[in-house]
Amino acid sequence: MRVLVIPDIHLKTWIFDRAEKILKDGKADRAACLMDIPDDWNMEFQIEQYKETFDQAITFAVDYPDTLWCYGNHDVSYPWGRLETGYSPYAERMVISKFEELENSLKSPTQIDIMHRIDNVLFSHGGLTADFLKWLDEDLLDAEIDDVIAAVNDASHDFLWNDESPLWFRPQYETREIFRPDTYKQVVGHTPVEKIFEKESIISTDVFSTYGDGRQIGESAMIVIDSETGKYEKIEVMGKWECDSDERTDIAIFRFN
């Protein structure tokens, strides 16, 4: 199955427009969103932008009902009452309400969680390590994969609100024992990168995040990954900063192993 990966949103409604174009063009069969829907630089008072972004996410969820959603640290910070950089106390009640609306728009409540698996690809915001599983429950190291994911998704907030968890881990900078890298590819966001790249079977995709002045940090691209082989295509899209007035998605495809 070809899965389009939608990286961190951070109040950028146009990312859903680009994703929709890729799906409509038949480049992918379904999508997985790595979320972090709320918060961005100096946006605490822009309540309407929060609302518009969640409404766009909800519309996308309805239009593409097979989409999977992976909570990010900025998402859970609101219902969990954990302050995060960029947290907006002014948007708090609306964000919590919109998350409930998003969850209720899904075909199944299991479509939104910390981690998901499609065949041989694992999706989470930050990535899963063997070290985290040892801390959570060492028996999980030898458990069936669906039992592992269920245990992660059912873990307490204290376990998950931790730098080593799939909400927070940064494989781009931290050296840890990755979970079954010879068996599964992982796709993550969370940490802004200049280029989409793979390291120890973890593919980093957060290229749309910005500097404090609004400039995009990374390239304008998303990936479509084959859920069985783990091979992926990088699809270039028109970034918001490149052309505010042009809603077209210009596509070029490069194949990676």
Residue ranges and their predicted role:
Residues 234-246:
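Short, solvent-exposed aromatic-acidic interface loops
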